[in-house]
Curated annotation (Swiss-Prot):
Keyword vocabulary terms for this entry: DNA-directed RNA polymerase, Nucleotidyltransferase, Transcription, Transferase
GO-annotated molecular function: DNA-directed RNA polymerase activity
Lineage top rank: taxon: Bacteria
Coiled-coil residues: none
Origin organism lineage: Bacteria, Bacillati, Bacillota, Bacilli, Bacillales
Subunit record text: RNAP is composed of a core of 2 alpha, a beta and a beta' subunits. The core is associated with a delta subunit and one of several sigma factors.
Residue ranges with Acidic residues bias: 109-179
The protein, known as: Probable DNA-directed RNA polymerase subunit delta
Matching PROSITE patterns: HTH_HARE (PS51913)
UniProt function note: Participates in both the initiation and recycling phases of transcription. In the presence of the delta subunit, RNAP displays an increased specificity of transcription, a decreased affinity for nucleic acids, and an increased efficiency of RNA synthesis because of enhanced recycling.
GO terms under cellular component: DNA-directed RNA polymerase complex
């Protein structure tokens, strides 16, 4: 039903959300929130101050009701006007893109460079792996050498190679008597 078909009494008793829906259906274009409020005041024949108390609830209802969609910049429309793909395009701000330059030989060389760089990385990783394996071999050799040194040290403990000569007790007594 068109807004023109409603009586003034019916428009006064109509909920704000239903009235907004009818306004959008008749206009068939997006409207800013303030324009929507002005049109509602005009249709219901009330003062804008009379609507102020219900404005917050109306805005909430407009957001919740699935028939309406916010298009940004306080513009609203009916969801049925926009296919899903177009909604995303219209709602999201336009992204400025730079014009693509034609590929040059430098771009081709750059692509080759990427391949070379990848090959070098693989070679470096293989070298690192070889070094780790070599380190493991060295660690085993070091462990064997350390064990041999420990055994040699234990054998050396039994010998007296501190450079001191041993003196018998008898020799001590003789030295003391001479003094």
């Amino acid at each position: 039903m068109s807004l023109k078909e409603y009586s003034q009494e019916q428009l006064k008793h109509m909920s704000l959300v239903e009235l907004a829906y009818e306004i959008f259906r008749d206009s068939k274009t997006p409207i800013t929130f303030s324009e929507l409020i002005d049109e509602m005041v005009r249709l219901q024949g009330i003062q804008k101050s009379d609507l102020d108390d219900r404005l917050a609830q109306f805005y909430t209802d407009l957001n919740i009701d699935g028939r309406f969609i916010s298009l940004g910049d306080q513009r609203w429309g009916l969801r049925s006007w926009y296919p899903v793909d177009q909604i995303e395009e219209e709602v999201q701000p336009a992204v400025k893109t730079k014009a693509k330059k034609k590929k040059t030989k430098a771009a081709v060389v750059e692509e080759d460079f990427d391949e070379i760089e990848e090959e070098e990385e693989i070679e470096e990783l293989e070298e690192d792996l070889d070094l780790v394996e070599d380190d493991d071999d060295l660690d085993l050799d070091d462990d064997e050498e350390i064990e041999e040194e420990i055994e040699d040290f234990d054998e050396d403990d039994d010998e007296d190679d501190d450079g001191l000569t041993e003196i018998d007790e008898d020799d001590l007594d003789d030295n003391e008597e001479e003094k």
